[in-house]
Amino acid sequence: MNDAEQASIYCDAQHAGSLGPGRTLCRLVDLSKAETLLDVGGGTGAMSIRLLEANPKLVSTIIDFPNVAEIGWKFISEAKMVDRIRYIPSNALTTQWPKEQGAILMSYLFSGIPGTEVPRLVEYAFECLEPGGNLMIHDFMVKDNRSGPPMAALWQLQHMAFTPDARSVTPGWLRTRLNEVGFIDIKEDEMIPGLTKLIHARKPS
């Protein structure tokens, strides 16, 4: 995301493609008790915007690269969310995350980072959540036996062209990592049929 023109093209497409799944996410996860959301690698804020629309007392912090944050402010301003969304313009893998968060979202993040970082970020999310807080992981996922679905596999392959050391994450593998860290109430839902899944869980109160 260091090239401004490429970042703009990618972010515009990603924003449009995330608004629909954002509505689905609102139906699947109850954030009515949460007051703070950390959107890690949240791009231009499409998911945050949808979650804040559905939860009036929620405010969001998005961590993403500075040029992505600059593009995101356009969408956040159009959604009239400038007083409820803030950016930490930085690399989510290296910057410090705010603690005591009511919810943490990582959407399309794991498919675009080195696979060795995934377990560490799961542990860091647990650390940064308040007791009872929700973790939401949305991404391209193939079945545990890797037999499909074809579109999810193709999208994962496309991402690996840009991040060769990314990991092809499966729901079962991810559920095991969450359980090892200490998450409870681990659930799996389909977000975009045949393409993406949502794994969500809760930190014990």
Regions found by a protein language model. Give the residues of each.
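Alpha-helical subdomain
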Residues: 36, 40-205
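Conserved Class I S-adenosyl-L-methionine-dependent methyltransferase catalytic core
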Residues: 1-35
